[in-house]
């Protein structure tokens, strides 16, 4: 291996990406990707050998490849002896001309990935051009991160019950049909000492 000490989530994400490049979307890949998309509160970076862990790594590696130069960017990442987020930050900081800016810190890169996997927009960093993500999770298609909750009725205050979230995981909510009044959001953590972002 060119980088024998790389973190497993990157190795397995690259392995699933190689399978995609060789065989296209298979039942195994949709199973991996959709397991995470349906449970995106699971960490992209913490490896617990769950099916969703493979899918998280695959989607993140596909995002990096799409935005930072394709196969050559993944070759650069694999050859980099730094591991994990450090190698990814190096790649993003030294992206080839024509790459889509996605940030240069893991926090910024992950925030842009979060938007891309949640909405799959055609705009810059906020979608995938190398995958066609479907709204619903069905076996033949790779789906977007599924909403953790939604609200389209504004008669009463809306709350979401306890939502667990691992570090480097995602929770996505949809709000629509509001009055145009400011939206106030309050999150109450059960653990302290962690950073998070509302996008």
Q: Where in the sequence are the language-model features?
A:
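Beta/coil-rich, acidic/histidine-enriched accessory regions frequently appended to metallopeptidases
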Residues: 83-199
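A residue-identity detector for tryptophan
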Residues: 9, 36, 46-47, 154, ...
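Active-site-proximal alpha-helical
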Residues: 37-119
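Short, isolated positions within intrinsically disordered regulatory regions of eukaryotic proteins
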Residues: 13, 40, 50-51, 158, ...
């Amino acid at each position: 291996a060119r980088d024998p000490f790389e973190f497993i989530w990157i190795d397995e994400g690259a392995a699933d990406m190689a399978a995609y490049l060789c065989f296209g979307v298979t039942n195994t890949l949709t199973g991996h990707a959709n397991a995470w998309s349906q449970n995106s509160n699971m960490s992209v970076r913490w490896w617990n050998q769950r099916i969703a862990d493979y899918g998280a790594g695959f989607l993140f590696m596909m995002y990096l490849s799409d935005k930072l130069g394709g196969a050559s960017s993944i070759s650069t990442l694999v050859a980099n002896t730094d591991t994990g987020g450090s190698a990814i930050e190096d790649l993003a900081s030294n992206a080839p001309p024509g790459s889509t800016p996605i940030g240069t810190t893991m926090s910024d890169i992950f925030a842009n990935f979060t938007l891309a996997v949640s909405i799959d927009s055609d705009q810059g960093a906020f979608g995938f051009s190398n995958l066609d993500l479907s709204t619903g999770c069905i076996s033949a298609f790779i789906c977007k991160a599924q909403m953790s909750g939604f609200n389209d009725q504004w008669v009463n205050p809306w709350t979401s019950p306890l939502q667990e979230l691992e570090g480097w995981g995602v929770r996505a909510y949809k709000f629509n049909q509001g009055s145009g009044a400011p939206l106030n959001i309050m999150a109450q953590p059960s653990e302290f000492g962690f950073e998070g972002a509302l996008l």
